[in-house]
C-alpha cells in the first residue's frame, strides 16, 4: 500500500491517509500526528548537520508541542517547522513504491447566454452542457450531455446513440450525480487548464445547482474543496484544491516538465505538436455549434478529452509527478513547486545519515540580500554565418559545481567580505541608472546586468592575483573577523595543507567531510547513470519505460536542487552558496572556452578566433577557419568523418583539463575536480548566429548519432527564431523554415534567397487582407 493523499486534523491530532493498494483497491489509514523538534544540548544523543549535539522533544498533542516550543523561543531549534503530514509520510512510506493511480481525464462545455454572454468561474450562471471523462483504469471515455432547448428528445437521443458510452440528460443535477458516481474510484482528476476553468466552474456550479455540501463529492474524507487564490495574467483568480482525491492541471504539468518553451499552450497547438492531432474544427462559435450541429458538439467535447489522454500516454507526466512525490515523501501537488520537495529530499537524506536539520531562518530585510545573485554566463556571439560549428557542454553544471566544491551550509568555513564587489556594484548601478532615458538623480539599475563581464567577485580576483596591497576581511562562521592581505588569504587556502577550497564568490568551504546536499546530489547522479544504463539495456522491452522514468526523475531532482537552494524561502537557502555556484560555474565555462581555443588556435582566451558563442554550460566553436589554408592546399582532406574525429578529440582535451584547473582555481582535490565533465554534444555543417539565445544550426551529428543519413540533409536546431509562434500564420512559418533550409541545408546562393523573399512579398501583397493574420491559414 502507498499513499495517494493525506490530511492533518489539528483538532484530533491525527493524520488521515488515502491509499491505493497493489490489489487496485482504495484503502484508508490513519496515524497519530507526531510533533517533533530538536534543541542544542551538550548531553544530546543526536547530531545536527553542523555536528553539534542535540536532544529531541516529541508529543502527540499539538498544544503541548507549541507550549514546549515557546520555552525555547529565541534559541536555535531543529525541525520544529517540518510539515507534520510530510513527517508522517517520511516515517511511514519512505522507500515504498509509488501506487498506480486511477486517473480521470475530463473536460466540460458550458452554455452561452445571448443577453449576459459567457459566465465567469466565480459566477457560473450558465449551465454545464457536456462533460467527458476518460477513466484510465477502465480504459473508457464516457460523455454526459444535455441537448439544446429547441431539440426534441427523440432527435437528441438519435444523435447520442451514434456515440458509445454517451448518456443524454434532461437536468444538470442528474448529470452531476452521474459524474460523481463515475469519479468515485478516481484518485486524480486532470484536465487542460482545469485549475483555471473546469474545477472552479464545476465546484461553484454544483454549489449553485445542488448545494455546498454536495461539493464534498469532489473530495474524499468528507472534506470540502479548499479555495485558493493564484495569479493569472497579472490578476488574482480563485480556484479549488481537492482533498483525498487530487486535482492536477495537465497544462501546468506540461509547462513544468516539458523543458522546451512553447509559443502557444492551447490544447490544439500542443496536441498537434506532440501527437499530430487537433481539436475538432468547426465554423462559427461554440454556442452555434451546440445549437446547430449537436453531433459535432459531442464529437468536439470527446476529442478534447481524448486529445489530452493521447498527450499523456506519450509524455506520462502524471506518472513522473507521482514518482517524484513518493521518492521524496511529499504530496502530489507539492511537486508543482520545487522548494518543499527538495527540502524533504535533503531532510530524508540527513535522517539516513543520523542527522537533523535546522529550522528555516526568519527573513531579515537586508539591502545586501536584495542584490540579485549573479546568473549564468552568456557570451555575445560572433554574428553571421559559420561553417563546421561544434558544441561542447558540461554535464549537469550546477549540481556538479555544488559537488566539486562540497557546497553546503555545514561545510562553510568563512566568507571573504565583499567590500570591493559591493562598491563596484553600487557604482555600476548608479552609472547605468544615470544613462537611462529620463533618469533622475540617484536612479539605480539592478539585476543580473551588474554581473556582466565578471567571472567572480573582485575579492576572488585579488586573491588569485595574490595582491599584497589589497586588504580584505575574512568573516569566519564562528563569529571571528580577521583582516588579511589577498596574498595571505591565497596562501592560507592554497598553500597551508588545510582541507579548504575557495569559490569564485570568495566563500571558503571544507572538503574534510561531505556535506549532506553534495552527498545527496552525488547519490542522485550515480543512480541516474545506473538507471540510464539499465534503460539502454532494456530498450524494446516492458522494463524500458520503468527505468527511463526513474532516470528522468533523477534528472529533474538534480536540476531542481540548485533552483530550490537559491530560493530565499528554502530552509537551506544561503546566498553565499547560490552565488558560489553561478560564479564558480562562470569560471569553469570560461576555462573550457579558453582551453578549446588554445587547442584549436594556440591562444588561451575565451574570446579567441575559434569561439563562436557560449551559453551557461556550453561552448560553440569552429576549427574550420584555422584549417582553411591546409584544406585549400590539399594538405587536409576535410570531410564530416574527419570533423567528428577532430571535434571529439578537442572535447576530450577540454574534459581532461578540468582536474588541474579545479585545483588551480579553487584548491579542489583531484577527485573533486574529476566531477566536472564535458562532452561533445553536436556538430553542424552550417549555422547562423544572430544575438544571445538566437541562432540556428544544421546538425549532422548529435552525441555520436548521425542526422544526415537516408536522404536527410540534417536536423535544424533553431533557438529563439520565432518559427513556431502561435500568432504567426502557418504559411509564414513554412516560408521562414523554407528560407532557413535554403541557407543551412540546400546551399542556395544569396541571390536565390533574396529572390525567394521578394516572391513571398509579392504573393503576400496580392493576398486578401483577412487571410494574412490567421494562424490557421
Explain the meaning of each model-derived region.
Residues 1-185, 219, 302-303, 307-329, ...:
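DnaQ-like (DEDDh/DEDDy) 3′-5′ exonuclease domain used for proofreading
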Residues 141-145, 150-166, 170, 189, ...:
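Active-site-proximal helix-loop-helix substrate-binding element of RNase H-like nuclease domains
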Residues 159-166, 183-188, 290-296, 327, ...:
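Glycine- and acidic
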Residues 179-202:
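Proline-aspartate-enriched helix->loop->beta-strand connector
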Residues 198-208, 395-409:
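Short active-site loop/helix that positions an aromatic residue
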Residues 279, 589-616, 628:
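Active-site palm subdomain of RNA-directed nucleic acid polymerases
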Residues 287-406, 414-416, 421-434, 543-595, ...:
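Common nucleic-acid-contacting/processivity interface regions adjacent to the catalytic cores
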Residues 620-777:
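C-terminal polymerase-core module
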Amino acid at each position: 500500500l502507498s499513499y495517494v493523499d493525506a490530511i492533518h486534523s489539528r483538532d484530533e491530532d491525527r493524520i488521515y491517509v488515502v491509499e491505493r493498494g497493489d490489489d487496485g483497491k482504495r484503502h484508508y489509514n490513519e496515524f497519530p500526528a507526531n510533533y517533533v523538534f530538536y534543541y542544542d544540548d551538550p548531553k544530546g544523543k543526536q547530531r545536527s548537520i553542523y555536528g553539534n549535539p542535540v536532544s529531541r522533544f516529541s508529543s502527540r498533542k499539538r498544544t503541548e508541542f507549541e507550549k514546549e516550543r515557546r520555552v525555547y523561543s529565541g534559541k536555535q531549534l531543529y525541525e520544529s517547522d517540518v510539515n507534520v503530514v510530510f513527517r508522517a509520510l517520511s516515517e511511514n512510506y519512505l522507500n515504498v513504491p509509488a501506487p498506480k493511480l486511477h486517473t480521470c481525464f475530463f473536460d466540460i462545455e458550458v452554455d452561452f447566454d445571448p443577453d449576459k454572454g459567457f459566465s465567469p468561474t466565480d459566477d457560473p450562471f450558465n449551465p454545464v452542457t457536456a462533460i467527458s471523462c476518460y477513466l484510465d483504469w477502465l480504459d473508457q471515455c464516457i460523455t454526459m450531455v444535455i441537448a439544446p432547448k429547441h431539440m426534441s428528445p427523440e432527435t437528441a437521443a438519435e444523435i447520442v446513440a451514434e456515440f458509445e458510452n454517451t448518456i443524454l440528460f434532461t437536468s444538470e443535477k442528474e448529470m452531476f450525480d452521474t459524474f460523481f458516481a463515475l469519479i468515485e474510484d478516481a484518485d486524480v482528476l486532470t484536465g487542460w487548464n482545469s485549475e483555471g476553468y473546469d474545477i472552479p466552474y464545476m465546484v461553484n456550479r454544483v454549489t449553485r445547482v445542488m448545494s455546498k455540501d454536495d461539493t464534498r463529492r469532489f473530495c474524499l474524507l468528507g472534506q470540502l474543496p479548499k479555495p485558493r487564490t493564484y495569479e493569472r495574467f497579472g490578476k488574482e483568480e480563485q480556484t479549488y484544491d481537492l482533498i483525498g482525491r487530487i486535482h492536477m492541471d495537465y497544462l501546468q504539468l506540461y509547462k513544468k516538465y516539458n523543458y522546451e518553451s512553447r509559443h502557444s499552450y492551447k490544447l490544439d497547438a500542443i496536441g498537434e505538436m506532440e501527437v499530430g492531432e487537433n481539436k475538432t474544427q468547426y465554423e462559427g462559435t461554440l454556442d452555434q455549434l451546440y445549437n446547430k450541429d449537436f453531433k459535432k458538439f459531442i464529437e468536439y467535447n470527446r476529442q478534447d478529452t481524448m486529445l489530452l489522454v493521447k498527450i499523456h500516454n506519450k509524455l506520462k507526466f502524471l506518472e513522473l509527478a507521482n514518482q517524484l512525490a513518493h521518492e521524496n515523501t511529499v504530496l502530489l501537488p507539492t511537486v508543482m513547486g520545487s522548494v518543499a520537495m527538495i527540502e524533504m529530499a535533503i531532510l530524508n537524506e540527513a535522517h539516513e545519515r543520523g542527522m537533523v536539520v535546522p529550522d528555516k531562518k526568519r527573513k531579515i530585510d537586508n539591502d545586501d540580500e536584495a542584490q540579485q545573485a549573479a546568473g549564468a554566463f552568456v557570451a555575445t556571439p560572433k554574428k553571421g554565418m559559420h561553417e563546421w560549428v561544434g558544441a561542447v557542454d558540461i554535464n549537469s553544471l550546477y549540481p556538479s559545481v555544488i559537488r566539486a566544491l562540497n557546497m553546503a551550509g555545514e561545510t562553510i568555513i568563512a566568507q571573504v567580505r565583499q567590500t570591493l564587489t559591493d562598491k563596484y556594484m553600487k557604482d555600476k548601478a548608479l552609472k547605468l541608472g544615470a544613462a537611462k532615458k529620463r533618469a533622475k538623480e540617484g536612479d539605480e539599475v539592478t539585476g543580473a546586468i551588474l554581473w556582466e563581464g565578471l567571472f567572480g567577485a573582485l575579492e576572488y580576483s585579488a586573491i588569485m592575483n595574490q595582491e599584497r596591497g589589497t586588504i580584505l576581511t575574512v568573516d569566519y562562521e564562528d563569529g571571528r573577523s580577521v583582516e588579511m592581505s589577498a596574498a595571505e588569504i591565497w596562501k592560507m587556502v592554497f598553500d597551508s595543507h588545510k582541507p579548504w577550497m575557495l569559490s569564485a564568490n570568495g566563500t571558503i568551504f571544507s572538503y574534510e567531510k561531505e556535506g549532506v546536499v553534495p552527498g545527496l546530489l552525488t547519490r542522485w547522479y550515480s543512480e541516474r547513470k545506473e538507471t540510464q544504463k539499465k534503460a539502454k539495456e532494456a530498450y524494446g522491452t516492458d522494463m524500458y519505460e520503468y527505468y527511463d522514468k526513474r532516470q528522468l526523475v533523477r534528472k529533474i531532482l538534480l536540476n531542481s536542487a540548485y533552483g530550490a537552494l537559491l530560493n530565499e524561502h528554502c530552509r537551506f537557502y544561503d546566498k553565499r552558496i547560490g552565488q558560489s555556484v553561478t560564479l564558480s560555474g562562470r569560471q569553469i565555462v570560461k576555462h573550457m572556452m579558453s582551453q578549446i581555443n588554445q587547442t584549436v588556435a594556440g591562444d588561451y582566451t575565451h574570446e579567441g578566433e575559434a569561439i563562436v558563442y557560449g551559453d551557461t554550460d556550453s561552448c560553440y566553436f569552429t576549427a574550420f577557419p584555422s584549417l582553411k589554408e591546409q584544406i585549400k592546399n590539399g594538405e587536409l582532406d576535410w570531410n564530416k568523418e574527419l570533423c567528428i574525429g577532430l571535434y571529439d578529440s578537442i572535447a576530450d582535451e577540454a574534459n581532461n583539463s578540468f582536474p588541474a584547473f579545479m585545483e588551480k582555481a579553487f584548491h579542489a582535490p583531484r577527485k573533486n575536480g574529476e566531477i566536472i565533465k564535458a562532452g561533445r554534444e553536436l556538430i553542424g555543417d552550417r549555422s547562423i548566429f544572430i544575438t544571445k539565445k538566437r541562432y540556428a544550426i544544421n546538425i549532422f551529428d548529435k552525441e555520436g548519432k548521425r542526422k544526415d543519413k537516408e536522404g536527410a540533409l540534417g536536423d535544424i536546431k533553431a533557438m529563439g527564431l520565432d518559427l513556431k509562434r502561435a500568432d504567426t500564420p502557418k504559411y509564414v512559418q513554412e516560408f521562414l523554415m523554407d528560407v532557413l533550409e535554403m541557407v543551412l541545408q540546400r546551399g542556395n546562393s544569396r541571390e536565390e534567397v533574396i529572390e525567394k523573399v521578394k516572391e513571398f512579398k509579392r504573393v503576400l501583397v496580392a493576398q486578401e487582407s483577412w487571410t494574412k493574420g490567421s494562424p490557421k491559414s
